[in-house]
């Protein structure tokens, strides 16, 4: 049955506007799979980028799933980050080869607003497409966390200009 927005309007306009904006943002993000590449020695940068979105997704009634290789999330960190402790689920010590499959299954269920998984290798186009399709089906967001070591980055010559001066010779 269709009813107009006017007939269903609420007397508290700001709340209705806020809810509509939140729903629009959540729907726009659904089906999104994004890779976050960060330096292992600077994990806080990735957290600073993701926490606002994770807080917003935490307002949904669904879970947030963290598939972590070794680290265990501390209750204190989850609470101090503003994430809903009662909606955060973690599976730790997951073998890297199982992370992709677990992400696809979790995204597809629709039980999670966001699924975050750590990958050591880059995904193929086919693997990425499978994640995107699962996120669309489950109306969820997926984040692939990809740590890189500073010494693993390809070495290149620094761009710069060497200025010789006969004043110093």
Curated annotation (Swiss-Prot):
Classification via InterPro entries: Cell_div_suppressor_SulA, P-loop_NTPase, SulA_CellDiv_inhibitor, SulA_enterobact
Sequence similarity: Belongs to the SulA family.
Keyword annotations from UniProtKB, A to Z: Cell cycle, Cell division, DNA damage, Septation, SOS response
UniProt PTM comment: Is rapidly cleaved and degraded by the Lon protease once DNA damage is repaired.
Protein induction: By DNA damage, as part of the SOS response.
Region of interest (Lon protease binding), ranges: 162-169
Stored Pfam families: SulA
Complexes and interactors: Interacts with FtsZ.
Site entry: Essential for degradation by Lon protease: 169
Protein name (Swiss-Prot/TrEMBL): Cell division inhibitor SulA
GO biological process, one term: negative regulation of cell division
Region named FtsZ binding: 106-112
Biological role: Component of the SOS system and an inhibitor of cell division. Accumulation of SulA causes rapid cessation of cell division and the appearance of long, non-septate filaments. In the presence of GTP, binds a polymerization-competent form of FtsZ in a 1:1 ratio, thus inhibiting FtsZ polymerization and therefore preventing it from participating in the assembly of the Z ring. This mechanism prevents the premature segregation of damaged DNA to daughter cells during cell division.
């Amino acid at each position: 049955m269709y009813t107009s927005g006017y007939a269903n309007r609420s007397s508290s306009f700001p709340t209705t506007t806020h809810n509509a904006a939140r729903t629009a943002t959540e729907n726009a993000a659904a089906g999104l799979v994004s890779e976050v590449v960060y330096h292992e020695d600077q994990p806080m940068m990735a957290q600073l980028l993701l926490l606002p979105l994770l807080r917003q997704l935490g307002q949904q009634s669904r879970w947030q799933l963290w598939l972590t290789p070794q680290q265990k999330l501390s209750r204190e960190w989850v609470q101090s980050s503003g994430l809903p402790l009662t909606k955060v689920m973690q599976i730790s010590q997951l073998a890297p080869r199982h992370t992709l499959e677990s992400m696809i299954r979790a995204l597809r269920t629709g039980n999670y607003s966001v699924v975050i998984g750590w990958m050591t290798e880059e995904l193929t186009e086919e693997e990425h497409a499978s994640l995107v399709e699962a996120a669309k089906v489950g109306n969820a967001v997926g984040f692939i966390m990809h740590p890189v070591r500073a010494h693993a980055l390809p070495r290149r010559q620094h761009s710069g200009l060497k200025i010789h001066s006969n004043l110093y010779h």
